[in-house]
């Protein structure tokens, strides 16, 4: 139980480290130039866009994990259904085999009885 939690914490720390590394504050030269201000604005917009993109992707990942979870549950249910149907099929197959054997025995007995009756009729006619 502790290992999955530890693994998740390690993954979270790694993601947090990468996130911090990606979005480190860019030290910009402080200047009154219009170009510097435009560059700063562009960089801030770029960082904002990247953060929004990251948030969208994280949400997409969460949704995909949910879809995978649902599909795994469905696959598990389907597997359980297949197992139960297999068991039922095996039981029915055994029952069919037993009934066929019983049927064959009855037919054999009936044929013997019919043969005896035919033999009796033949002996009476002679």
From Swiss-Prot:
It comes from the Eukaryota. Stabilizes the ATG5-ATG12 conjugate which is necessary for autophagy. The ATG5-ATG12/ATG16 complex is required for efficient promotion of ATG8-conjugation to phosphatidylethanolamine and ATG8 localization to the pre-autophagosomal structure (PAS). Also recruits ATG3 to the PAS. Involved in endoplasmic reticulum-specific autophagic process and is essential for the survival of cells subjected to severe ER stress. Residues 32-109 form a coiled coil. Homodimer. Part of the ATG5-ATG12/ATG16 complex. Several units of each may be present in this complex. One of its GO terms (biological process) is protein transport. It comes from Kluyveromyces lactis (strain ATCC 8585 / CBS 2359 / DSM 70799 / NBRC 1267 / NRRL Y-1140 / WM37). GO terms for cellular component: phagophore assembly site membrane. The gene is ATG16. This is Autophagy protein 16. Keywords: Autophagy, Coiled coil, Membrane, Protein transport, Transport. Its main location: membrane. It is a peripheral membrane protein. It is found in: Preautophagosomal structure membrane. Belongs to the ATG16 family. The keyword Protein biosynthesis does not apply.
